[in-house]
Structure formats: C-alpha cells, structure tokens
Amino acid sequence: MASSSSGGAGGAGGASGAPEVKIHNVYMSNVEEEFARIRGFVEDYPYVAMDTEFPGVVATPLGTFRSKEDFNYQQVFCNVNMLKLIQVGFAMVNDKGELPPTGDVWQFNFNFSFAEDMFSHESVEMLRQAGIDFTLLQNNGIPTAVFGELLTTSGLITDPRITWLTFSSGYDFGYLLKSITLGDLPKEESTFFMCHKTLFPTSFDIKILLRTPNCASAKLKGGLQEVADQLDVKRQGVRHQAGSDALLTAATFFKIKKQFFGDNWNQIAPLICGHMFGLGSSLSLFHSSGSTSRLGDETPQGLIGVPQQA
C-alpha cells in the first residue's frame, strides 16, 4: 500500500519557494520501491534526519550503576531488546538543509501486533491519537529483517560522507542497529558505541549541540517540539509521527547550526560527532556552571521514562 501526505510548502527549513513536502507512508507493499528512490538521493542529499516511534519504555534495570549514563544504556539495552519498532522517519537534505525538489520524506511502518508484541499502553495510545493505524501495521507492516536488509544496501550506512541528524538518539540508533544486526544490542555500552561508529560514522545529536557553549546563552530546553518552537521552526505534518519528526529534526539542526555556530562549526563538530545524549560521556561534555546546565539540573528524561522524541 503506497500512500503519502503533503505538508505545506517549504523544505526542511520551511523556506519560501521550497518544494511541497510529501511524507510517504511506506509499508511492506512498497518498501523496495521507496528504498530504490532513497538510493537515488544519497549522493546529493547526504544529511539524513532520523526519528523512530516505538511502543514506549516497559522495563527499568535494577542493580548498581557506575553513572547515570551507565543506567541509561542498560535501560536502552533492556527495552530495545524486548520491544519492536513501530515507525522510522527519514528526511534527506543537502548541506543547506534543503529537501530534494520532489519534497520526499519517508515514514516506514513496521509489522506490529497487540496480541504478540509488548508495549506501553500510554505510549501506544499517544501514537494512535497521532494517527498511526495499527490495523495496517499488523496486516501490511514491514518486518524488521526486511527493513534492515534494505537499509544495509541503501548507501546510507558505513559511509562517513552520510551525516545522521537526531534528537536524543540513544533509542533511535539502538533500534536501527538491532534492525541491521537482527540480534540483541551489546551488553557493554563500549561495544554499542563501536557498532554505532562503524554503521553511522558521522552523526550529530541536537541535545548534544544544546550543551555547547555556543548555545548556552539561548537556554534552549525541552523536547524537539519545544526547542523548535523556541527557534520559531515550524512543523510540517503530525507530531509523534516519525516522518514529520524527522523533518522537524532536520530543520531544527540547520537553524541551530546557522544561528549559533557559523564559521565555528568545523571546530565544534569533531568534539560532538558520534555522541548520543544521555549515553557514553555525553552528560559531562562542556560541563561547567557557566557554559551549560549542570549534570544534576538536566536529567536525560529522553532515556529515563518516556523518550524525548518530539
């Protein structure tokens, strides 16, 4: 089943004269066709903003943890291994944040069954209210193995020229990694980061950008929608649907990059590339009372409780 929804005129940044946005709903019946289209855009649109929707957080790890980041990874580990993807959104843009002339954004819909798969009732109800059709997911959703195989051959992974853009990305990359390997996430966080570096060698997490001294004075806080609102970045599409959230991620990233970094980007980028908010050493990056919020002031709610996707 091929379907698409159109937003208002505008590219990732909502610029006047940009193409009309077309969010393609991708199911099993058209997944190969849409990945073929994606392969045609890789060279000229190498920035891939990505968002996932999944059935919440159902498990909390118990035990003694070395740090908040250690706890956070164990929570990602438990939940990603237990749960299934519901949607993945890709918005591909060029180095100016512009969509292809066709305005394509992709929203992949995965096979999901209330009878067989685990979920958080609260999270699933939120997604249902956002318009996700769970009957279609059960009947025509994409099996994870099919998506992982097509993603592997898409030209989007293992290439450092492809830049992945995310917002609080631990769960996002966790689910993508699981779809590619078809196995559980590594128990050790260091192994997870090695796999991430191999598959997604260039990636930036907006939540990490917000911790840099460049952004400190703006005091941008909250989830993706709240940060976008503070920057006057307009959403196209429906909140809590992965295609719209991916597009908003792209627009927000390029607004931050232009407004706060300018000629300084090439100095900052190597320091934050590959970091995921709440994991690794991310909570100690740029850690000072003068430059950004202190560790105790900004609990990574995107990893403890309901993920901060939008």
Curated annotation (Swiss-Prot):
Disruption phenotype: RNAi-mediated knockdown either results in sterility or a reduced brood size. RNAi-mediated knockdown disrupts the arrangement, differentiation and maturation of oocytes in the proximal region and as a result small oocyte-like cells arrange in several rows in the germline. RNAi-mediated knockdown reduces miRNA-mediated deadenylation. RNAi-mediated knockdown reduces ccr-4 and ntl-1 protein levels. In another study, RNAi-mediated knockdown does not alter the levels of let-711 or ccr-4. RNAi-mediated knockdown results in reduced global poly(A) tail deadenylation. One of its GO terms (molecular function) is metal ion binding. It is found in: Nucleus; Cytoplasm. Highly expressed in the germline. In particular, highly expressed in germ cells that enter meiosis and progress through the pachytene stage. A divalent metal cation 2 binds at D51, E53, D245. Disulfide bonds: none annotated. Keywords: Cytoplasm, Exonuclease, Hydrolase, Metal-binding, Nuclease, Nucleus, Repeat, RNA-binding, RNA-mediated gene silencing, Transcription, Transcription regulation, Translation regulation. The keyword Metal-binding applies. It catalyses: Exonucleolytic cleavage of poly(A) to 5'-AMP. GO terms for cellular component: CCR4-NOT complex; CCR4-NOT core complex; cytoplasm; nucleus; P granule; P-body. GO terms for biological process: miRNA-mediated gene silencing by mRNA destabilization; nuclear-transcribed mRNA catabolic process, deadenylation-dependent decay; nuclear-transcribed mRNA poly(A) tail shortening; oogenesis; positive regulation of transcription elongation by RNA polymerase II; regulation of translation. It is an enzyme of class 3 (hydrolase). Component of the CCR4-NOT complex at least composed of ccf-1, ccr-4 and let-711, which is required for germ cell development in hermaphrodites. Within the complex interacts with let-711. Catalytic component of the CCR4-NOT complex which is one of the major cellular mRNA deadenylases and is linked to various cellular processes including bulk mRNA degradation, miRNA-mediated repression, translational repression during translational initiation and general transcription regulation. Within the complex, plays a role in miRNA-mediated deadenylation in embryos. Within the complex promotes germ cell development and fertility in hermaphrodites. Additional complex functions may be a consequence of its influence on mRNA expression. This is CCR4-NOT transcription complex subunit 7.
